[in-house]
């Protein structure tokens, strides 16, 4: 596994802590924003408690993404599973995904830690992403995650953004 440092993504939204928390911990919330632009998810299981399981399909649904996936010889959807390993309601969660859908790459775990910090009418969301198996995949991970955050910016409006 890569010795690269964790990636840090921070956004501040004009939303409530409960609204953002529900996006991470409910089926409807998760399906409403998870996945980069051009993709959607279908949640099959979400048990948002310590040790609980998250299972979903990531599905290319925009014509340009479908064409790109087909051109690369990649499937249009893949099954994803993870485990909630830490939950402090409306404050912090840790979600560990099993990365077992990359051709030619041994399965491994990728962890993300999400924290919420209320500030007046806004909430700052800080997400720490563990690096993927190589720098290029880590770059793509950050790009994809940043893309899906655009869905939240459209929904709530973003006050301030930062990534490292």
Task: Identify the function of each model-found stretch.
Residues 3, 48, 73-78, 104-108, ...:
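A generic structural micro-feature
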Residues 154-164:
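Short, highly charged C-terminal tails/helix-capping segments
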Residues 1-41, 45:
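Hydrophobic ligand-binding cavity/cleft-lining segments
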Residues 20, 30, 54-56, 84, ...:
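Hydrophobic pocket/interface hotspot
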Residues 42-96:
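Glycine-rich portal/gate segments that line the openings of hydrophobic small-molecule binding cavities
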Residues 85-86, 92-146:
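Beta-strand/loop substructures that line and gate deep hydrophobic ligand-binding cavities in soluble
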């Amino acid at each position: 596994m890569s010795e690269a440092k964790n990636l840090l993504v921070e956004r501040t939204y004009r939303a409530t802590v409960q609204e953002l928390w529900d996006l991470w911990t409910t089926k409807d919330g998760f399906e409403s924003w998870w996945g980069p632009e051009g993709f959607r998810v279908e949640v099959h299981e979400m048990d948002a408690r310590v040790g609980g399981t998250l299972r979903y399909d990531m599905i290319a649904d925009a014509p340009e993404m479908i064409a790109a996936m087909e051109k690369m010889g990649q499937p249009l959807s893949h099954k994803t599973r993870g485990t909630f390993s830490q939950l402090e309601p409306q404050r912090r969660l840790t979600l560990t995904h099993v990365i077992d859908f990359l051709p030619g790459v041994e399965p491994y775990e990728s962890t993300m830690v999400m924290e919420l910090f209320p500030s007046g009418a806004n909430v700052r969301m800080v997400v720490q992403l563990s690096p993927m198996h190589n720098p290029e995949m880590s770059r793509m991970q950050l790009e994809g995650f940043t893309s899906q955050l655009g869905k939240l910016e459209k929904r709530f409006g973003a006050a301030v953004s930062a990534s490292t």
